[in-house]
């Protein structure tokens, strides 16, 4: 997660509250994407953090977190929340596979495949993102909870994602790998 808006940490509400986690405020979106695509459950998380970019600022917390996550099916995921980077705000996403690799960057989706001669062929798909009104999305979720429509599904997914984010926080605080149940 390339945040690229360091001024929001230094001058906005994120730097003024008693605790702000770039993991809970940013990395959580990547965990959501991974879980949505793979449906994987995580069994181990080890995270590292630093405060280099915001070292001499009012912002008191980490500006970069990198987590290595192992799933129950032994897939490995790496999530980086880089809030101090010089990069447009964007959720970069790469899936490496044995038959193809998918890379989602700002302006396109790239598929890397090998042909019969073992040469890599790159297919590029241009993307146009729709902007989503977060207020509408939040109201939809709240209405589902209040009506108990898909309540269990929303709850379990949401709580599992939060559980994984809290394991990242614990790994940083203890400087240890966290084993999940």
PLM region spans:
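NAD(P)-dinucleotide binding in Rossmann-like oxidoreductases
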Residues: 56-62, 72-137, 154
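A structural signal for well-ordered alpha-helical segments within the folded catalytic domains
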Residues: 28-32, 132-139, 156-163
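C-terminal helix-rich "cap/oligomerization" subdomain common to oxidoreductases
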Residues: 72, 140-181
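Predominantly a Rossmann-like dinucleotide-binding segment in NAD(P)-dependent oxidoreductases
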Residues: 1-58, 175
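Active-site rim elements
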Residues: 20-21, 125-128, 147-155
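Secondary-structure boundary/capping signal
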Residues: 41-42, 46, 75, 149-150
């Amino acid at each position: 997660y390339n945040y690229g808006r360091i001024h929001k940490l230094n001058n906005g509400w994120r730097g003024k509250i008693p605790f702000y986690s770039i993991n809970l405020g940013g990395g959580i979106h990547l965990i959501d994407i991974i879980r949505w695509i793979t449906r994987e459950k995580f069994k181990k998380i080890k995270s590292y953090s630093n405060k280099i970019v915001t070292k001499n600022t009012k912002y008191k917390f980490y500006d970069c977190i990198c987590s290595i996550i192992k799933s129950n099916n032994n897939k490995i995921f790496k999530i980086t929340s880089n809030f101090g980077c010089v990069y447009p705000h964007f959720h970069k996403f790469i899936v490496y596979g044995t038959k193809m690799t998918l890379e989602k960057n700002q302006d396109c989706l790239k598929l890397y495949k090998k042909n019969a001669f073992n040469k890599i062929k790159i297919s590029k798909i241009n993307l146009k993102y729709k902007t989503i009104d977060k207020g509408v999305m939040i109201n939809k979720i709240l209405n589902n909870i209040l009506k108990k429509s898909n309540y269990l599904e929303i709850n379990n997914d949401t709580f599992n994602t939060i559980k994984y984010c809290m394991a990242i926080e614990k790994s940083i605080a203890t400087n240890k790998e966290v084993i999940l149940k």
